[in-house]
Design a protein with these regions (language model features):
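Acidic-glycine-rich active-site phosphate/pyrophosphate-binding loop
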Residues: 18-34, 71-76, 135-137, 192-208
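Claisen-condensing/thiolase-fold acyl-transfer catalytic domains that form or cleave C-C bonds
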Residues: 10-17, 21, 43-62, 158, ...
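Solvent-exposed alpha-helices and their adjacent loops that cap or buttress functional pockets
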Residues: 33-35, 61-64, 88-92, 103, ...
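Flexible, glycine-rich active-site loops centered on histidine and acidic residues
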Residues: 62-95
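Short beta-strand segments
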Residues: 3-4, 44, 69-75, 100, ...
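Short glycine-rich phosphate-binding loop at a beta-alpha junction
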Residues: 1-4, 175-185
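Condensing-enzyme catalytic core mediating Claisen C-C bond formation in acyl metabolism
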Residues: 84-159, 163, 255, 263
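Glycine-rich beta-alpha junction loops
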Residues: 7, 75-76, 103-104, 114-121, ...
Length: 263
Protein backbone atom coordinates (compact mmCIF):
# COMPACT_ATOMS: atom_id res chain seq x y z
CA UNK A 1 0.00 0.00 0.00
CA UNK A 2 1.52 3.28 -1.14
CA UNK A 3 -0.13 6.51 -0.01
CA UNK A 4 1.12 9.68 -1.67
CA UNK A 5 0.21 12.89 0.11
CA UNK A 6 1.60 16.15 1.47
CA UNK A 7 -1.19 17.13 3.85
CA UNK A 8 -3.28 13.98 3.73
CA UNK A 9 -4.32 13.60 7.35
CA UNK A 10 -5.41 16.82 9.06
CA UNK A 11 -8.41 17.17 11.36
CA UNK A 12 -11.10 19.66 10.38
CA UNK A 13 -10.37 22.03 13.29
CA UNK A 14 -6.59 22.22 12.82
CA UNK A 15 -3.88 22.59 10.20
CA UNK A 16 -1.43 20.30 12.00
CA UNK A 17 -0.47 17.24 9.97
CA UNK A 18 -0.82 13.86 11.67
CA UNK A 19 1.94 11.58 10.37
CA UNK A 20 2.25 9.14 13.26
CA UNK A 21 1.33 6.45 12.48
CA UNK A 22 1.65 6.81 8.73
CA UNK A 23 -1.47 7.38 6.69
CA UNK A 24 -0.80 4.16 4.78
CA UNK A 25 -0.81 2.18 8.04
CA UNK A 26 -4.16 3.74 8.93
CA UNK A 27 -5.52 2.75 5.52
CA UNK A 28 -4.30 -0.82 5.95
CA UNK A 29 -5.94 -0.99 9.38
CA UNK A 30 -9.26 0.34 8.06
CA UNK A 31 -9.16 -2.22 5.22
CA UNK A 32 -8.55 -4.95 7.85
CA UNK A 33 -5.63 -6.44 5.94
CA UNK A 34 -4.05 -9.04 8.23
CA UNK A 35 -1.04 -10.08 6.13
CA UNK A 36 2.09 -8.39 7.63
CA UNK A 37 3.86 -8.93 4.29
CA UNK A 38 1.57 -6.28 2.83
CA UNK A 39 3.92 -3.36 3.40
CA UNK A 40 2.41 0.11 3.84
CA UNK A 41 4.34 3.36 3.46
CA UNK A 42 3.80 7.03 2.60
CA UNK A 43 5.36 9.16 -0.12
CA UNK A 44 5.84 12.90 0.27
CA UNK A 45 6.94 14.11 -3.14
CA UNK A 46 4.86 17.21 -3.79
CA UNK A 47 2.12 17.06 -6.39
CA UNK A 48 3.93 14.32 -8.41
CA UNK A 49 3.63 11.92 -5.45
CA UNK A 50 0.89 9.70 -6.87
CA UNK A 51 2.63 9.25 -10.22
CA UNK A 52 5.85 8.46 -8.32
CA UNK A 53 3.92 5.85 -6.35
CA UNK A 54 2.76 4.25 -9.59
CA UNK A 55 6.35 4.19 -10.85
CA UNK A 56 7.56 2.54 -7.64
CA UNK A 57 4.73 0.00 -7.72
CA UNK A 58 5.67 -0.93 -11.27
CA UNK A 59 9.27 -1.52 -10.13
CA UNK A 60 8.13 -3.70 -7.22
CA UNK A 61 5.98 -5.83 -9.52
CA UNK A 62 8.61 -6.12 -12.25
CA UNK A 63 11.27 -7.20 -9.74
CA UNK A 64 9.00 -9.84 -8.22
CA UNK A 65 8.81 -8.08 -4.85
CA UNK A 66 5.05 -7.62 -5.21
CA UNK A 67 2.17 -8.95 -7.28
CA UNK A 68 -0.42 -6.33 -6.44
CA UNK A 69 -0.11 -2.72 -5.22
CA UNK A 70 -2.68 -0.18 -4.05
CA UNK A 71 -1.58 3.38 -4.83
CA UNK A 72 -3.54 6.22 -3.24
CA UNK A 73 -3.16 9.95 -3.79
CA UNK A 74 -4.88 12.20 -1.25
CA UNK A 75 -4.56 15.72 0.11
CA UNK A 76 -6.52 18.24 2.20
CA UNK A 77 -5.11 21.52 0.95
CA UNK A 78 -8.12 23.46 2.20
CA UNK A 79 -6.82 23.01 5.75
CA UNK A 80 -3.36 24.39 5.06
CA UNK A 81 -4.28 27.19 2.68
CA UNK A 82 -4.25 30.86 3.64
CA UNK A 83 -7.64 32.38 2.86
CA UNK A 84 -5.92 35.77 2.52
CA UNK A 85 -3.56 34.51 -0.18
CA UNK A 86 -4.83 34.71 -3.77
CA UNK A 87 -2.84 31.56 -4.63
CA UNK A 88 -5.21 29.66 -2.32
CA UNK A 89 -8.24 30.17 -4.54
CA UNK A 90 -7.76 26.99 -6.56
CA UNK A 91 -6.58 24.69 -3.75
CA UNK A 92 -8.91 21.77 -3.04
CA UNK A 93 -9.25 18.44 -1.25
CA UNK A 94 -9.38 15.10 -3.03
CA UNK A 95 -8.35 11.47 -3.21
CA UNK A 96 -7.96 8.85 -5.89
CA UNK A 97 -6.61 5.32 -6.06
CA UNK A 98 -5.73 2.50 -8.42
CA UNK A 99 -4.60 -1.09 -8.03
CA UNK A 100 -1.72 -2.32 -10.18
CA UNK A 101 -1.16 -6.05 -10.52
CA UNK A 102 1.12 -8.33 -12.48
CA UNK A 103 -0.12 -10.10 -15.59
CA UNK A 104 1.30 -11.81 -18.65
CA UNK A 105 -0.27 -9.44 -21.15
CA UNK A 106 2.02 -7.67 -23.59
CA UNK A 107 -0.70 -5.23 -24.67
CA UNK A 108 -1.00 -3.37 -21.38
CA UNK A 109 1.26 -1.94 -18.72
CA UNK A 110 3.68 0.92 -18.07
CA UNK A 111 5.90 1.35 -21.10
CA UNK A 112 8.31 3.94 -19.71
CA UNK A 113 8.77 6.55 -17.00
CA UNK A 114 10.97 9.47 -16.05
CA UNK A 115 11.53 11.30 -12.73
CA UNK A 116 13.69 14.25 -11.68
CA UNK A 117 14.28 16.50 -8.66
CA UNK A 118 15.66 20.04 -9.04
CA UNK A 119 17.17 21.81 -6.00
CA UNK A 120 20.57 23.22 -7.00
CA UNK A 121 19.35 26.68 -8.01
CA UNK A 122 16.97 27.12 -5.10
CA UNK A 123 14.02 25.33 -6.70
CA UNK A 124 13.28 23.61 -3.38
CA UNK A 125 12.00 26.96 -2.05
CA UNK A 126 9.50 27.62 -4.85
CA UNK A 127 6.78 26.02 -2.71
CA UNK A 128 7.09 26.14 1.05
CA UNK A 129 5.30 26.36 4.40
CA UNK A 130 5.04 29.94 5.67
CA UNK A 131 3.14 32.53 7.70
CA UNK A 132 -0.18 34.09 6.71
CA UNK A 133 -0.28 37.05 4.32
CA UNK A 134 -2.29 38.96 6.92
CA UNK A 135 0.05 40.66 9.43
CA UNK A 136 -2.50 40.42 12.27
CA UNK A 137 -2.71 36.64 11.85
CA UNK A 138 1.00 36.01 11.36
CA UNK A 139 1.84 38.21 14.37
CA UNK A 140 -0.52 36.44 16.74
CA UNK A 141 -0.27 32.87 15.49
CA UNK A 142 2.44 30.29 14.85
CA UNK A 143 0.34 28.52 12.25
CA UNK A 144 1.93 27.91 8.87
CA UNK A 145 0.28 27.70 5.47
CA UNK A 146 1.20 26.40 2.03
CA UNK A 147 2.89 29.15 0.03
CA UNK A 148 4.47 29.42 -3.39
CA UNK A 149 6.37 31.74 -5.68
CA UNK A 150 3.83 31.45 -8.47
CA UNK A 151 5.82 33.06 -11.26
CA UNK A 152 8.88 30.92 -10.53
CA UNK A 153 6.78 27.75 -10.46
CA UNK A 154 5.15 28.71 -13.77
CA UNK A 155 8.45 29.41 -15.51
CA UNK A 156 10.07 26.29 -14.08
CA UNK A 157 7.21 24.10 -15.30
CA UNK A 158 7.25 25.51 -18.83
CA UNK A 159 11.03 25.19 -19.10
CA UNK A 160 11.34 21.65 -17.72
CA UNK A 161 8.15 19.59 -17.92
CA UNK A 162 7.87 19.33 -21.74
CA UNK A 163 11.40 17.92 -22.00
CA UNK A 164 10.77 15.44 -19.18
CA UNK A 165 7.62 14.28 -20.95
CA UNK A 166 9.53 13.87 -24.21
CA UNK A 167 12.28 11.85 -22.53
CA UNK A 168 9.62 9.56 -21.08
CA UNK A 169 7.70 9.18 -24.32
CA UNK A 170 10.83 8.60 -26.42
CA UNK A 171 11.80 5.76 -24.10
CA UNK A 172 8.46 4.05 -24.81
CA UNK A 173 9.41 3.73 -28.52
CA UNK A 174 5.86 4.73 -29.44
CA UNK A 175 4.96 7.13 -32.23
CA UNK A 176 3.75 10.53 -31.12
CA UNK A 177 0.68 10.30 -33.35
CA UNK A 178 -0.43 7.23 -31.36
CA UNK A 179 -0.60 9.11 -28.05
CA UNK A 180 -4.32 9.38 -27.24
CA UNK A 181 -4.53 11.32 -23.96
CA UNK A 182 -2.30 13.29 -21.61
CA UNK A 183 -3.35 13.44 -17.97
CA UNK A 184 -1.38 16.30 -16.46
CA UNK A 185 -1.45 17.57 -12.88
CA UNK A 186 -4.29 20.10 -12.61
CA UNK A 187 -2.27 23.02 -11.25
CA UNK A 188 -3.22 25.84 -13.57
CA UNK A 189 -5.17 25.61 -16.83
CA UNK A 190 -3.11 28.21 -18.67
CA UNK A 191 0.15 26.59 -17.53
CA UNK A 192 -0.97 23.07 -18.44
CA UNK A 193 -2.06 24.13 -21.92
CA UNK A 194 1.27 25.91 -22.47
CA UNK A 195 3.20 22.80 -21.35
CA UNK A 196 1.35 20.58 -23.82
CA UNK A 197 1.84 23.07 -26.63
CA UNK A 198 5.60 23.09 -25.97
CA UNK A 199 5.64 19.28 -25.72
CA UNK A 200 4.23 18.87 -29.23
CA UNK A 201 6.48 21.62 -30.52
CA UNK A 202 9.46 19.43 -29.54
CA UNK A 203 8.18 16.84 -32.04
CA UNK A 204 7.48 19.50 -34.67
CA UNK A 205 3.91 18.28 -35.05
CA UNK A 206 0.62 20.08 -34.42
CA UNK A 207 -1.13 19.43 -31.13
CA UNK A 208 -4.11 17.10 -31.66
CA UNK A 209 -7.55 18.24 -30.62
CA UNK A 210 -9.06 16.66 -27.51
CA UNK A 211 -5.71 15.40 -26.20
CA UNK A 212 -5.87 17.18 -22.84
CA UNK A 213 -8.76 16.47 -20.44
CA UNK A 214 -9.11 19.12 -17.72
CA UNK A 215 -11.26 19.28 -14.58
CA UNK A 216 -9.64 22.06 -12.55
CA UNK A 217 -12.67 24.29 -13.13
CA UNK A 218 -14.89 21.86 -11.22
CA UNK A 219 -12.49 20.17 -8.80
CA UNK A 220 -9.65 22.63 -8.24
CA UNK A 221 -6.03 21.72 -7.49
CA UNK A 222 -6.06 18.80 -5.06
CA UNK A 223 -2.30 18.18 -5.40
CA UNK A 224 -1.49 14.46 -5.64
CA UNK A 225 -5.15 13.60 -6.21
CA UNK A 226 -5.66 15.52 -9.46
CA UNK A 227 -4.39 12.89 -11.90
CA UNK A 228 -6.08 9.79 -10.40
CA UNK A 229 -9.43 11.60 -10.04
CA UNK A 230 -9.27 12.97 -13.59
CA UNK A 231 -8.25 9.56 -14.94
CA UNK A 232 -11.20 7.99 -13.13
CA UNK A 233 -13.65 10.50 -14.62
CA UNK A 234 -12.46 9.85 -18.17
CA UNK A 235 -12.14 6.08 -17.73
CA UNK A 236 -15.65 5.68 -16.33
CA UNK A 237 -17.52 7.80 -18.84
CA UNK A 238 -17.42 10.20 -21.75
CA UNK A 239 -16.12 13.15 -19.72
CA UNK A 240 -16.34 16.42 -21.66
CA UNK A 241 -15.90 14.47 -24.88
CA UNK A 242 -12.92 12.51 -23.54
CA UNK A 243 -13.03 8.72 -23.34
CA UNK A 244 -10.58 5.82 -23.30
CA UNK A 245 -10.54 2.55 -25.21
CA UNK A 246 -8.63 -0.66 -24.54
CA UNK A 247 -5.14 -0.39 -25.95
CA UNK A 248 -4.95 3.41 -25.90
CA UNK A 249 -1.54 4.91 -25.20
CA UNK A 250 -1.79 7.60 -22.52
CA UNK A 251 0.62 9.68 -20.47
CA UNK A 252 0.59 10.91 -16.89
CA UNK A 253 2.74 13.97 -16.12
CA UNK A 254 3.19 16.05 -12.99
CA UNK A 255 5.25 18.84 -11.47
CA UNK A 256 5.32 20.16 -7.92
CA UNK A 257 7.12 20.97 -4.70
CA UNK A 258 10.69 19.81 -4.52
CA UNK A 259 10.83 20.77 -7.34
CA UNK A 260 9.85 17.35 -8.63
CA UNK A 261 8.81 16.28 -12.12
CA UNK A 262 7.70 12.90 -13.40
CA UNK A 263 5.94 11.24 -16.31
Amino acid sequence: IIVAHNFGDISSNSNQIDTLPSLSSKVKSILKIKNPKCVAYDIICGCPGWVEGVIQAKSFIKSGMATKCLIIGCDTLSRVSDSNDRDSMIYADGSGAIILESNDSTSSGILSHNSATYTFDGENDFLYYGASCTPEISKNSNQKYIKMHGRKVYEFALNNVPNAMKDCFDESKCKIENLKKIFIHQANKKMDEAIIKRFYRLYKVPQPENILPMNIEEYGNSSVATIPTLFDLVKKSDYKGHKLNTGDIIMFASVGAGMNINA
